[in-house]
Amino acid sequence: MGKIPAIGIDLGTTYSCVGVWQNSKVEIIANDQGNRTTPSYVAFNETERLIGDPAKNQVAMNAKNTVFDAKRLIGRKFDDKKIQEDLKLWPFKVINEKGKPKIEVEFKGERKRFAPEEISSMVLTKMREIAEVYLGGKVKDAVVTVPAYFNDSQRQATKDAGSIAGLNVLRIINEPTAAALAYGLDKNLKGERNVLIFDLGGGTFDVSVLSIDEGSLFEVKATAGDTHLGGEDFDNRLVNHFAEEFKRKHKSDIKGNARALRRLRTACERAKRTLSSSTEASLEIDALHEGIDFYSKISRARFEELNMDLFRSTMQPVERALSDAKMDKKAIHDVVLVGGSTRIPKIQKLLQDLFGGKQLNLSINPDEAVAYGAAVQAAILTGVGSSQIQDLLLVDVAPLSLGIETAGGVMTNLVERNARIPCKQQQIFTTYSDNQNAVTIQVYEGERAMTKDNNLLGTFNLTGIPPAPRGVPQIEVAFDLNADGILNVNAKDNSTGKSEKITISNDKGRLSKAEIDRMLSEAEKYKVEDDRQRERVQSKNNLEAYIYACRQAVDDAPSGVLSETERSKVRDKCSSEASWLDKNSLAEKEEFESHLKECQRICTPIMSKIHGGKKGKSSMGKGSHPTVEEVDG
């Protein structure tokens, strides 16, 4: 078997998707439920950890211990305004640990705390496992996507999540850029085309303007967006609307009932999807709260009214990206829609009107385009695939200006917003007072004139500057922004040659190497536990299936084949084992196996009489038993 290829993962707020370049094309890989996207949900209960569809499916019964939206927490500080707003809506508990948000759940009877990176790493692990089943081997390398408007600490934290998941993250790439790759390859473009990617997903929003030359040079001209806007916010408006309606109709408030709110949210999500193709949607929820059934309807017009300010707010980044790219709307050849929320007719209408009635391009799958592009980039970086993709060149940009604080708290930019990456910029600075022997370099990102209004990335000192009048020392500060959009800063005193450097690892938001190592070993431990739980359930199912098959065989056996004593012997043994199973459903794998052996010891000789003469065909031969995958109803 050849080398296992690198994969592309779209790590989404609400759903994730994985793809791989194989046989000269991208394969989007379906999960074990047959779905090509997997919910970014992780659930913890008394016995196991669930990831993806199984986690989302049980959320109403276990709302407090089912975690989602990790992407809205990752790389942010606990006191971030957006996190404080979200806290009011999340059913799970988020606590403040040294300024960082941590998620607290109950798992196997114990309180556990997880960093957002750990939850994201569990989703990444699930996506890796989906790919491994398909590819038939261990996957090590991956390209992971992030919103174009993610800042330095959010990018670093996503990379850390990849490390905890045991992945070698080849590159962090921007979601709209990945979607543009998918579009460019799919359409086999000729000549130079200016493309605007409008990417509105479950939790984040990006706009990127690119020029694509001959379908091989992809150059991002500008990017804009909002890392906290998406389908979930539209769901929130619906949830609030119906919660108020319930209160009006039934004089009862459901806001303190986590299970009721979760069931209402699931119904609202479904209604929102229905309203993309119908003008009205119904909600029917039995015994929503205090035994009260809730039935209601909502029209598309009312849904649009509830969200109009959010819908309109998506147009401003479009205008800003065009302005930064120095392009007129008329210069855009294709407006390409990506992300599930672009299916909303009103958003399409607003965008179409903004472009003077221009036909929007709906030709790529909005749920899969980002993973598709990530898989292409993974193939490019590992040197596989045809010249069709090896000749592709991708030029991206920095989403935010980067600079240092100078006298008076002024932000002095070294890297301007929308500068091409990777890039290096340097500038000479000097001292502010006589005989100053050290300078503190404070690195910020953002667009405001004063550093207090921007985001502090990191601080370091350059010491040992020889005494001199103010303005004489020459301190060269160099910014090196790599292809992942992650920053290294170097400061050098030109008179002594002494230098200090820092990789912006944002101590306020980022995990230390030791923390990552600890989380990696914990992730391994959880995997062992998950595998053990899977084996335990399988051995329980095997025993259950064997009991059922023996009973069935005895009941169906023609008269005369077995004596009444033999029939009773099998039935009695099966009854006692079934009774033991009922009382010991949480027993260990070894116990189930031991009971199965005991059951086989008594039943197999009798079973072989029923199947006598059918040597080799019996599914009840010595030591064998039917393997039946059972599904809880």
Swiss-Prot record:
UniProt entry tagged with the keyword Methyltransferase: no
- GO MF annotation list: ATP binding; ATP hydrolysis activity; ATP-dependent protein folding chaperone; heat shock protein binding; protein folding chaperone
Give the PROSITE patterns listed for this entry: HSP70_1, HSP70_2, HSP70_3
Give the span(s) annotated as Disordered. 610-633
A single GO CC term for this protein reads: cytoplasm
Gene Ontology terms describing biological process = chaperone cofactor-dependent protein refolding; protein refolding
Q: Which Pfam families does this entry report, sorted A to Z?
A: HSP70
- The entry's keywords: ATP-binding, Nucleotide-binding, Stress response
Say yes or no: keyword DNA-binding present: no
The family note in this entry says:
Belongs to the heat shock protein 70 family.
The record, for NCBIfam families, names: PRK00290.1
> What is the protein name given in its UniProt record?
Heat shock 70 kDa protein cognate 2
Task: Name the gene.
Answer: Hsc70-2
